[in-house]
């Protein structure tokens, strides 16, 4: 029988889960107001009054609510996004950055702010209201919420398309360093060309080519996506459809692409990858994606489980996969040999080789 203490712990855990969205909204508030940047610009811990003064300077017409800001900062300090320390002389709290909030600085190369604003945007939040219904009826929460798939919305709405591209580019910068380090020999061994399938605006292939100038980079995505891409040295932008044809290359790379699609769709994409590299002596496909370990305790194992449910809300049939599921998927598409390379960052690198 549960003790009174156990029952209270259980109750507290449900309360915490129930209101977990408050953490996300407080985080969004801090990003929207640029609070990490305000603290960073001072070069020292700041008071709430100094934060308010900076907000007034940035937006002269604003009238910041100091009570709200103080309470929001109190929660974010508790969540370790900021620190606070009482200044003895002034008897005011001084706020400073932590290792977490340093990832929210807009001028930093490693800035997760666009992704925070993406995931907390009403368009992305609305599908979650349909998760239970869709679990009963086997339908798509995003289509229920918006009447179309996320890719169709991006095609129809240029503003949303740019928003999506910015978030995806942001996700790239968080992992590129670890990827270049952990797969250095793999990139060095590519004889000539590398096509980034679903490469968005080309930021990841640009970084790979910059680190390995012998590689001829091809950024491949839908025409309306590459139309907004900047020019990068050694990178050619190509518009097309990965479900129809993929440009020939010595190797193919896909970052967080296959988790957006069903096994059937992934098989089509992978077979097109097979055709793209089949004439090459050492052709291979490099998949940067999650490899689920449901019982794992590493830094990002829990995030894999979260992303798996995230795919339900954002895509029609996307999902994260265990190594056993990857093995079946790759084998069915003509890739019987593969290696899983775990990195310190969230996704793994899967090297797949044709027969």
UniProtKB/Swiss-Prot annotation:
<dbReference type="InterPro" id="IPR029063">
    <property type="entry name" value="SAM-dependent_MTases_sf"/>
</dbReference>
<feature type="active site" description="Proton acceptor">
    <location>
        <position position="259"/>
    </location>
</feature>
<dbReference type="GO" id="GO:0102917">
    <property type="term" value="F:(R,S)-reticuline 7-O-methyltransferase activity"/>
</dbReference>
<dbReference type="GO" id="GO:0008171">
    <property type="term" value="F:O-methyltransferase activity"/>
</dbReference>
<keyword id="KW-0017">Alkaloid metabolism</keyword>
<comment type="subunit">
    <text>Homodimer.</text>
</comment>
<dbReference type="InterPro" id="IPR001077">
    <property type="entry name" value="O_MeTrfase_dom"/>
</dbReference>
<protein>
    <recommendedName>
        <fullName>(R,S)-reticuline 7-O-methyltransferase</fullName>
        <ecNumber>2.1.1.291</ecNumber>
    </recommendedName>
</protein>
<dbReference type="GO" id="GO:0046983">
    <property type="term" value="F:protein dimerization activity"/>
</dbReference>
<keyword id="KW-0949">S-adenosyl-L-methionine</keyword>
<dbReference type="GO" id="GO:0032259">
    <property type="term" value="P:methylation"/>
</dbReference>
<dbReference type="GO" id="GO:0009821">
    <property type="term" value="P:alkaloid biosynthetic process"/>
</dbReference>
<dbReference type="Pfam" id="PF00891">
    <property type="entry name" value="Methyltransf_2"/>
</dbReference>
<comment type="function">
    <text>Catalyzes the transfer of a methyl group to reticuline to form laudanine. Methylates the simple catechols guaiacol and isovanillic acid as well as the tetrahydrobenzylisoquinolines (R)-reticuline, (S)-reticuline, (R,S)-orientaline, (R)-protosinomenine and (R,S)-isoorientaline. Involved in the production of laudanine.</text>
</comment>
<feature type="binding site">
    <location>
        <begin position="197"/>
        <end position="200"/>
    </location>
    <ligand>
        <name>S-adenosyl-L-methionine</name>
    </ligand>
</feature>
<feature type="binding site">
    <location>
        <begin position="241"/>
        <end position="242"/>
    </location>
    <ligand>
        <name>S-adenosyl-L-methionine</name>
    </ligand>
</feature>
<feature type="binding site">
    <location>
        <begin position="221"/>
        <end position="222"/>
    </location>
    <ligand>
        <name>S-adenosyl-L-methionine</name>
    </ligand>
</feature>
<dbReference type="InterPro" id="IPR012967">
    <property type="entry name" value="Plant_O-MeTrfase_dimerisation"/>
</dbReference>
<feature type="binding site">
    <location>
        <position position="221"/>
    </location>
    <ligand>
        <name>S-adenosyl-L-methionine</name>
    </ligand>
</feature>
<dbReference type="GO" id="GO:0042802">
    <property type="term" value="F:identical protein binding"/>
</dbReference>
<dbReference type="InterPro" id="IPR016461">
    <property type="entry name" value="COMT-like"/>
</dbReference>
<keyword id="KW-0808">Transferase</keyword>
<comment type="similarity">
    <text>Belongs to the class I-like SAM-binding methyltransferase superfamily. Cation-independent O-methyltransferase family.</text>
</comment>
<dbReference type="InterPro" id="IPR036388">
    <property type="entry name" value="WH-like_DNA-bd_sf"/>
</dbReference>
<feature type="binding site">
    <location>
        <position position="255"/>
    </location>
    <ligand>
        <name>S-adenosyl-L-methionine</name>
    </ligand>
</feature>
<dbReference type="InterPro" id="IPR036390">
    <property type="entry name" value="WH_DNA-bd_sf"/>
</dbReference>
<keyword id="KW-0489">Methyltransferase</keyword>
<dbReference type="Pfam" id="PF08100">
    <property type="entry name" value="Dimerisation"/>
</dbReference>
């Amino acid at each position: 029988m549960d003790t009174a203490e156990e029952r209270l712990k259980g109750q507290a855990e449900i309360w915490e889960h129930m209101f977990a969205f408050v953490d996300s909204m407080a985080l969004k508030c801090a990003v929207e107001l640029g609070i990490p940047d305000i603290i960073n610009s001072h070069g020292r811990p700041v008071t709430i009054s100094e934060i308010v003064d900076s907000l007034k300077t940035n937006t002269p017409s604003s009238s910041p609510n100091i009570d709200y800001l103080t309470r929001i900062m109190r929660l974010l300090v508790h969540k370790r996004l900021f620190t606070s320390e009482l200044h003895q002389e002034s008897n005011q709290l001084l706020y400073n950055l932590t290792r977490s909030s340093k990832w929210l600085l807009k001028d930093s190369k490693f800035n997760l702010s666009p992704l925070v604003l993406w995931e907390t945007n009403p368009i992305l939040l609305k599908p979650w209201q349909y998760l239970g219904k869709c679990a009963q009826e086997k339908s798509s929460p995003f289509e229920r919420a918006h009447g179309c798939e996320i890719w169709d919305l991006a095609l129809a709405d240029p503003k949303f398309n740019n928003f999506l591209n910015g978030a995806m580019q942001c996700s790239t910068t968080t992992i590129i360093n670890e990827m270049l380090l952990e797969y250095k020999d793999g990139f060095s061994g590519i004889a000539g060309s590398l096509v980034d399938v679903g490469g968005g605006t080309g930021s990841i292939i640009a970084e790979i080519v910059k680190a390995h100038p012998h590689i001829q980079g091809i950024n491949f995505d839908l025409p309306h996506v590459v139309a907004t891409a900047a020019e990068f040295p050694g990178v050619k932008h190509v518009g097309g459809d990965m479900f129809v044809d993929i440009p020939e290359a010595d190797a193919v790379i896909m970052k967080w692409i296959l988790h957006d699609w069903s096994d059937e769709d992934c098989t089509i994409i992978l077979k097109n990858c097979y055709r793209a590299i089949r004439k090459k002596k050492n052709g291979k496909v490099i998949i940067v994606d999650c490899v689920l370990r449901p019982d794992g305790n590493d830094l990002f194992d829990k995030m894999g489980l979260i992303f798996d449910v995230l795919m339900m809300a954002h895509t029609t049939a996307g999902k994260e996969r265990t190594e056993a599921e990857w093995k079946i998927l790759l084998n069915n598409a003509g890739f019987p040999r593969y290696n899983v390379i775990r990195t310190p960052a969230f996704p793994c690198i899967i090297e797949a080789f044709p027969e």
